[in-house]
């Protein structure tokens, strides 16, 4: 892992790098910029605040956070060295407040250890392939142009999309097409790939697009855009282990948050969004049995959800940036003092069981006598030491 690579990438950028950075920034509009900034900002309004953008990309969200918070220190991570190079130029005015790290996001813990940071105040994820990668034909992410089948977010990674196509078994290809591409015709496409590669290995995206088009029903070819898009998504996710990286990164990111710290995640397809939704829901839920009158220490919610469902871009942004259409934003705040003591459970009225004496139909309400007992494992006066006992 290369820590603090800012000087290095600036030194290697060469003539024209700043111009390329400005051009790329102009073409790459940061998705849900205002909403992402607002959801993170309350954790950054204090001296010495530190945030991590673990998928820095072109640095659009990072630039806005640094602009709004003059005392903020930012750690920017990305697995794509080209993105780091361009982001270094875009963020040059904040050079004394940023540290750039060449790493996949699941290397967050190691990166913070190397920088001597035990906790941070905010962590931001902007998942999926970037506009920069889609627009660079030689990267092989786009099915709209004929190019080499690469799809590596980090060009130094060992496995390309061509390697997957030419070496995976029929069952492996079927699995990734079905699971990662949600492709209904996965077995048929996998069979065609195995058959065609025996004649000649796959090297170009155009040949793969033609193969997919020839092996899906005519009705599918006429609707829903390019029929190869699901196959390309599946290959990209497999080559970069995108879902595995998300699953490994989120727990590390939350554990490194300071109390009141905030975690925000932008997703762009249902597979990664499902992982994020489940992880954040688990953090914001109690693991105690629902019938207990108190929440035992260690089983209470660790986070508060800051977004209702997956928030989406508004109509004005969609008109300006169609790529924002699939974006979903989810965020949580780490609760202070979570997991340290037991606390009384408050059960919403809608979840209370119908019992005699609660005023339900057929059971006239009668006065209840509140009795209290001391929890055996807590000292009197501690939060949660006294709980209501239902007679």
From Swiss-Prot:
Belongs to the methyltransferase superfamily. RsmH family. It catalyses: cytidine(1402) in 16S rRNA + S-adenosyl-L-methionine = N(4)-methylcytidine(1402) in 16S rRNA + S-adenosyl-L-homocysteine + H(+). Residues 368-380 have a biased composition (Basic and acidic residues). Residues 1-23, 284-391 are annotated as: Disordered. Specifically methylates the N4 position of cytidine in position 1402 (C1402) of 16S rRNA. S-adenosyl-L-methionine binds at residues 59-61, 78, 112, 126, 133. Gene3D superfamilies: Putative methyltransferase TM0872, insert domain, Vaccinia Virus protein VP39. Its main location: cytoplasm. It is found in: Cytoplasm. One of its GO terms (cellular component) is cytoplasm. One of its GO terms (biological process) is rRNA base methylation. It holds the Pfam family Methyltransf_5. PANTHER family: 12S RRNA N4-METHYLCYTIDINE METHYLTRANSFERASE, S-ADENOSYL-METHYLTRANSFERASE MRAW. One of its GO terms (molecular function) is rRNA (cytosine-N4-)-methyltransferase activity. It comes from Kineococcus radiotolerans (strain ATCC BAA-149 / DSM 14245 / SRS30216). Its EC number is 2.1.1.199. This is Ribosomal RNA small subunit methyltransferase H.
